[in-house]
C-alpha cells in the first residue's frame, strides 16, 4: 500500500487493525474503564459480531498482565505507573498487530511484569509480528531482537 496515495479509509484500517503502539504513558479517554480500554482494542480486531470472543480475549489479556479484577471497572487515572503501562500493553497486544511499535514497554514494570511482557513479545514475534522498539533496558532486549541499533552521543553505533 502506497501511504502517499492511500485513502483515509485505508489509513484508518491500517491504524486500527494492522498497527499497534505501546507508549510508556497511557493516553486514555476520560471516563473509560480499564476493561473498556482493552475491549475497545479487541473489538477493532474481532468486530462487533464476535463480541463474545472479544470479551473473553479482553479478560484473558487483563489477567495475563495481572491487572486485578477489582480494577477493571475503575478509571486508570488512579492506577500506578506500572498498572497503567501493563494496561497499555494489554490494549496494544490484544490486536495481534502486524507491526508493533514499542516505546519503553518495560519502563516502571517490576521483574514479574517484564517476564510477562517478554513472553507475549516472543509469542507475537513467532506469529510474524514485526516490532520496532526503543529500549533502555538492555538486559530485557538480550536475545529478543533480530537487529539492534545503539544510540551513543547522538549517533548510531
Predicted regions span which residues?
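ABC ATPase NBD coupling module
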Residues: 2-20, 126
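Q-loop/switch helix immediately C-terminal to the Walker
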Residues: 32-44
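Conserved ABC ATPase signature
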Residues: 75-79, 83
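Hydrophobic anchor residue at the start of the ABC signature
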Residues: 89
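Catalytic Walker B motif of ABC-type/P-loop ATPase nucleotide-binding domains
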Residues: 100-103
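Helix N-cap at the start of a conserved alpha-helix in ABC-type nucleotide-binding domains
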Residues: 111-112
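H-loop/switch region of ABC-family ATPase nucleotide-binding domains
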Residues: 135-136
Amino acid at each position: 500500500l502506497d501511504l502517499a496515495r492511500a485513502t483515509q479509509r485505508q489509513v484508518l484500517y491500517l491504524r486500527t487493525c494492522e498497527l499497534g503502539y505501546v507508549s510508556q504513558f497511557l493516553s486514555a479517554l476520560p471516563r473509560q474503564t480499564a476493561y473498556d480500554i482493552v475491549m475497545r482494542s479487541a473489538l477493532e480486531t474481532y468486530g462487533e459480531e464476535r463480541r463474545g470472543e472479544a470479551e473473553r480475549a479482553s479478560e484473558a489479556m487483563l489477567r495475563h498482565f495481572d491487572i486485578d479484577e477489582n480494577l477493571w471497572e475503575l478509571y486508570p487515572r488512579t492506577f500506578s505507573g506500572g498498572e497503567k503501562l501493563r494496561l497499555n500493553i494489554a490494549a496494544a497486544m490484544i490486536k495481534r498487530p502486524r507491526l508493533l511499535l514499542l516505546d519503553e514497554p518495560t519502563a516502571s514494570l517490576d521483574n514479574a511484569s517484564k517476564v510477562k511482557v517478554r513472553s507475549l513479545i516472543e509469542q507475537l514475534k513467532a506469529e510474524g509480528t514485526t516490532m520496532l522498539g526503543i529500549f533502555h533496558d538492555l538486559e530485557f532486549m538480550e536475545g529478543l531482537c533480530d537487529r539492534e541499533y545503539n544510540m551513543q552521543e547522538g549517533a548510531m553505533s
